[in-house]
Amino acid sequence: MKSLQADFFKVMKEGAIQYAAPLPFLDLICVGTATQTEVKEQIDLMYSLIHQQVDVIVLVPIDSKALVQPAVEAVRKGIPVINIDIQLDAQLLEQAGVEVAFVGPDNFAAAYEVGKLLGKKLRNEDKVAIIEGLAVADNARQRKRGFIKAIEEKGLR
């Protein structure tokens, strides 16, 4: 996971632990970084899991490009990778000839819908400020693009 300090990922971890608890055939290993900016540490965690020869890896990448290589190596060693929340770079995966399942939102579309809703509530002369997430996070970039597209279509700035 990304940061095990972030509330979102604390809840995700707790949910996974609760789900796995009654399943005797499932040995769950939850690992994550201390912050949402520790890309190298997350890469190291991925290689550690590969070295442990786990059966499957569920990955929430901090950086959608930097985590492609460890994901590719896992798949090539027979370890399926399920990518959740922030999608790994599809172009890099394609270049590597590897498929990774993705489960998560369409961040562009979600932010576009929020922008459209806001556009209905504001006047053209109103100004909108955007407070972004991490610039390295692809989901943050997608959300920004979707939101800006919607408000620009409404003539807001």
Language-model segments: residues:
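A residue-level marker of the well-folded mature domains of exported/periplasmic proteins
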Residues: 1-157
